[in-house]
């Protein structure tokens, strides 16, 4: 009888191909019998991680449904303020259990800690089996049917899998290191193992049924944009955003109200204003936050957009918007300087004026892109100077039609520099959006396109912010001109204008 062959892969393309191959699955659980609901053997045999085919799809759906009830921002909130003296693994599980509203999170964390090592293949002994039984009794008291037990098994599996990997991320991201940098430079999961459920072929290599595959994520990751620590479809980790929010919360990194809007599990629609009245009117309509449009600011002054000519006007607008009871982010073009220190100073002025976020673009007025290292230096300088300001790093690869294939690579550098979100105007095709969200660690912002997907579909594709850019300003100009022309030509005037008193009421009233 021949023994299984072990295949090792360390090149990025090979590892990604292996992760994406449905024939390669995590090593199946050791075929040891264990009582249902009361043993590690039962747990391993009941979770999505070690299943394939229909069982994997069914169990993965249970995990996805569990996570769908929980916005990443809620995970961050539950993890914030945790006792930093306890073991990182305990803190991770306690925070996630609390966010999922499980009873006695502290006890859940202790029991999961006792299960974790045995779950991943080490001998946990009878103590680990007893911990499984206690968890089942705590999380699903009285449940004995197969369907109910499978559901609770996958709840426990979710906690166990978060235990080690997220704790490693927390430890590696200490001292202010962006988690995006850790995931690419020092991934918490450095090696993954797979078993061939059936014969397949990866990177020109024949893999027989039963062969073992070892994937060196640490080596493969170097120099590549998309982090591999969360796997790839069809087994991509469904809790990536939750794990990152959990880590940030445990690290004590605050999530501002504006940042929280990007971590709600859906797309934030951010309309763009050009003066106080337009911003206040949008806020009065119920929009949770507004952005500014650099075109609207520049055009209102008779200046070209993107020419770094509106620095002081932008700061003045921020000062006016800061008087209002709404969150706002400022479009600051490229920071109005190629000196990172000057950009950081501008960011501080905007923050002190009341801005919750800043948009920094790498496109230049001459139609070229700024060097990626320069733009990253601006981002890093701003985050160091004003940690509480949400930095939305924009790349104009699609907008200017310059090397769109390098988009993910540029954004990876910006994420590593500390960007809180990334913006790709001009990207509107569904496949491109889905591929990019899979490569990112931070929330993706796109520009709304009337010909592209709607807000709900963009959210389903993984987009977390949708900007309207200059659309509203251009619509307002068109409306003003068409109304004047209709009156001149004796035609009908379109109704719907705001009453004079309503516009007056938008003013903050403090001079």
Specify the residue positions occupied by each region the protein language model found.
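Cytochrome P450 heme-binding Cys-pocket and its upstream "meander" loop
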Residues: 216-245
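Extended, intrinsically disordered, low-complexity segments
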Residues: 258, 470-511
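Alpha/beta enzyme core
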Residues: 256-328, 336-446, 450-468, 475-477
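Cytochrome P450 catalytic-core helices
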Residues: 153-179, 238-254
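Conserved cytochrome P450 K-helix E-x-x-R motif and the immediately C-terminal K′/meander segment
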Residues: 140-146, 176-219
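Cytochrome P450 heme-thiolate monooxygenase catalytic core
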Residues: 58, 71-168
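Active-site substrate-recognition loop segments, prototypically the cytochrome P450 B′-helix/B-C loop
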Residues: 1-86, 93-103, 237
């Amino acid at each position: 009888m021949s023994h299984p062959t072990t295949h090792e892969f360390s090149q990025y393309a090979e590892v990604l191909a292996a992760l994406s191959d449905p024939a390669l699955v995590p090593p199946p659980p050791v075929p040891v019998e264990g009582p249902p609901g009361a043993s590690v053997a039962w747990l391993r045999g009941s979770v999505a991680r070690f299943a394939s085919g229909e069982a994997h799809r069914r169990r993965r759906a249970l995990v996805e449904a569990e996570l769908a009830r929980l916005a990443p921002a809620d995970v961050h909130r539950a993890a914030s303020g945790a006792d930093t003296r306890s073991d990182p693994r305990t803190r991770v599980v306690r925070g996630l259990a609390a966010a999922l509203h499980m009873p006695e999170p502290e006890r859940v964390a202790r029991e999961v800690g006792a299960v974790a090592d045995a779950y991943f293949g080490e001998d946990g002994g009878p103590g680990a089996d007893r911990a499984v039984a206690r968890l089942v009794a705590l999380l699903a008291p009285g449940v004995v049917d197969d369907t109910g037990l499978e559901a609770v098994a996958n709840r426990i599996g979710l906690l166990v899998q978060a235990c080690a990997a997220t704790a490693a991320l927390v430890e590696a991201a200490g001292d202010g290191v962006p988690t995006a940098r850790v995931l690419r430079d020092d991934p918490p999961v450095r090696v993954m193992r797979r078993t061939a459920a059936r014969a397949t072929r990866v990177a020109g290599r024949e893999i027989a049924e039963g062969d073992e595959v070892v994937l060196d994520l640490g080596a493969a990751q170097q120099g590549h944009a998309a982090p591999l620590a969360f796997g790839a479809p069809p087994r991509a980790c469904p809790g990536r955003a939750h794990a990152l929010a959990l880590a940030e919360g445990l690290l004590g990194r605050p999530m501002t109200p504006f940042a929280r809007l990007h971590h709600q599990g859906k797309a934030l629609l951010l309309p763009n204003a050009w003066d106080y009245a337009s911003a206040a009117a949008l806020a009065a309509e119920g929009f949770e936050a507004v952005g500014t449009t650099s075109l609207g600011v520049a055009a209102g002054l008779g200046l070209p957009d993107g020419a770094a000519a509106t620095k002081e006007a932008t700061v003045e607008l921020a000062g006016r918007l800061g008087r209002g009871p709404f969150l706002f982010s400022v479009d600051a073009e490229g920071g109005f300087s190629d000196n990172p220190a000057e950009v950081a100073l501008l960011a501080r002025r905007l923050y002190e004026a009341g801005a919750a976020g800043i948009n920094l673009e790498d496109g230049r007025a001459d139609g070229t892109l700024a060097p990626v290292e320069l733009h990253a230096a601006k981002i890093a300088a701003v985050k160091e100077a004003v940690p509480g300001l949400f930095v939305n790093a924009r790349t104009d690869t699609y907008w200017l039609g310059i090397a769109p294939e390098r988009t993910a690579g540029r954004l990876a550098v910006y994420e590593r520099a500390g960007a809180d979100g990334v913006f790709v105007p001009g990207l509107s095709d569904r496949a491109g959006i889905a591929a990019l969200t899979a490569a990112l660690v931070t929330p993706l912002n796109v520009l709304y396109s009337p010909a592209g997907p709607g807000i709900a579909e963009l959210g389903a594709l993984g987009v977390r912010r949708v900007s309207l850019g200059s659309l509203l300003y251009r619509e307002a100009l068109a409306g003003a001109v068409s109304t004047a022309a209709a009156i001149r030509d004796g035609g009908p005037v379109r109704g719907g204008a705001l009453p004079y008193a309503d516009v007056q009421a938008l003013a903050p009233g403090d001079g």
